[in-house]
């Protein structure tokens, strides 16, 4: 969206990934205490909804959005994304024996790559659909509509985490 719809230079767009990475790094030391305090179920349910809302809120971004606001938005998204992935990874692997940990990690990596591939394909399909619907002269609207759809889909997936027993140990 930043390059295609807003016309930003690749270098500028790349610089905006720095706050995302910083958010991810910032979250690392706080994830374990958060999970210990609130539990996997609550963290994953809440965080999935927050990630979805954050994705959808990218639709509020325009070419005129101040850089400091974009940086904060990307920082928050990086933080939430990191909390999500670390929580899912540790929940998935925590009860595996040492013998099964390697296979479990490989299987988890494959599932994550598959889900990311499906996400990219879905995003491309939505952008294509909305570009055809709104026309190429309204590319920003097509991106915004796609982001809202992707955010809503992400929020719906929180239902999966409602199946985690509330007393799941850390």
For the regions a protein language model found, what residue spans apply to each?
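12-transmembrane solute porter fold
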Residues: 1-133, 138-168
């Amino acid at each position: 969206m930043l390059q295609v719809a807003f016309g930003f230079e690749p270098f500028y767009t790349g610089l905006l990934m720095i706050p995302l990475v910083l958010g991810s790094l910032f979250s690392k030391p706080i994830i374990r205490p958060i999970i210990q305090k609130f539990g996997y179920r609550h963290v994953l349910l809440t965080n999935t909804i927050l990630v979805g809302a954050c994705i959808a809120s990218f639709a509020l971004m325009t070419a005129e959005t101040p850089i400091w606001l974009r940086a904060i938005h990307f920082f928050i998204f990086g933080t939430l994304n990191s909390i999500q992935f670390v929580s899912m990874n540790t929940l998935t692997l925590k009860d595996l024996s040492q013998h099964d940990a390697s296979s479990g990690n490989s299987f988890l990596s494959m599932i994550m790559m598959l889900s990311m591939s499906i996400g990219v394909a879905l995003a491309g399909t939505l952008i294509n659909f909305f570009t055809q619907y709104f026309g190429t002269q309204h590319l920003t609207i097509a991106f915004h509509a796609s982001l809202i759809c992707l955010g809503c889909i992400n929020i719906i997936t929180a239902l999966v985490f409602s199946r985690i027993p509330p007393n799941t140990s850390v």
